[in-house]
Amino acid sequence: MSKTAISIKDLQFAYPPWSPDLEPAQIFEHLDLSITQSEERLILGASGSGKSTLCYLLAGLAPTYTGGTLTGELRVLEQDVRARCPPPQHVGVLFQDAATQLFTSSVEHEIAWGLETLGVPPTEIGFRVTAALRKFDLLTMRTRPPWALSGGQRKRLALAALWAQQPEILLLDEPLAGLDPDGRAEVRAGLEQLRTAGATLLKTDSHTDDDVPAVPVNLLEAKRLSETVALKALPQQHLIKAGVRVPPKAWQAFAKSQSTIKASPAIELRQLRFKYQDGPAVLHGLDFLIPRGQFVAIVGSNGAGKSTLVRHFNGLLRPTRGSVRVLAQDASRRSVGELARDVSFLFQRPERQLFANTVREEITYGPRQLNLPNVEDRVARSLARFDLESLADRPPALLSYGIQRAVTLATLTAMDTPILVLDEPLAGLDGRGRAQLLRWLAERRAAGITLIVVTYEMKLEAQVDRMI
């Protein structure tokens, strides 16, 4: 008879209030879950439903490091997690933002570090590091610093480090988010190898299009988990209502616009070359033009240089050679602040552009810095557009990933620039967040805004004006 890997009974958990005049934030009520050893389980839920919190609880990170009130039974490998955090050789965790768990000076050191803390012999460490690098296609990057990797490469590195440690249980918070098709295939193969060897896999996700229907599923909604069922047994309308993203059809709402090739250029590149200091060349003599009003997708695998390219459009990076022109002006002769009047930028990781104390202050900052007119009206409209009025005085840092993304979109709405650059805007979004983003893009496009979307999704050819 299989042993129980994870057992949760009548669990209730609330985070402490972020302000003295507020009530605790109740996340779970009467939660029940049972997973046997060597089983793979998928927890589906919308952004903010508590998927990440569930991983924190099972790893012993919450409430130990987060604070909060926990009642009920929570056992991992038959040990009470409330009494003792599970040791890393038993439980490994992949955070939703993999970059937060990378901290060493190189890719190979990142993989080796966890093995060293477990007391693995040096010769065995070398073998496991090389095997992990090969398994997750990181051999050519072994000496590179983790911060220099793309978002998808960082995700693969974090998974490679966990894979090398061979834990009995893996808690994987949206493990496929932000990965291109090759990266997803590598991750699936690595996880399947661990599962075949006897590991227990608990995955969370906010969408269904990347998962095998045979995997047992629990739906997390209204602070509780559903009964365990096969994914195909969950009606799509129920999933959509719960905020889960189903196989996307929303991109079909974008009909191709009339040809705008003869329109004046929004972005023009001439022999653009770029090389990071002490690093390899990334861009090699690029030439292309994006006319005003076009919807353009820049497509490529993780690490291909997509983010590096678009950061030239708003002056965050400057060419090593060649030129970039924005609205017919040489970008190298304009400051980042000046370019911000013409180009708004959505980072791949929303928390990188959130820094104010409240959501309202975050949306206000850009228009006020640029002395734009009607700042209060801009902020009010942006809050209303993304249903953020009730969160206007909350700190952005305490919001879920999907809501942080909505805040960043609200800031771009308030700026109302003629060019929008969005770096992997769909990564990590649940069904509601994806639908909200697509509606917003449709509105921007109808208003004549130039849209430049960086993506690893290869299925947009029929929906965009052009793919690069």
Question: Where are the regions a protein language model picked out?
Answer:
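Conserved ABC ATPase signature
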Residues: 145-149, 153, 395-399, 403
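The feature captures the beta-strand-to-loop junction immediately N-terminal to the Walker
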Residues: 44-46, 299-301
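Conserved ABC transporter NBD signature motif
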Residues: 67-82, 322-330, 339
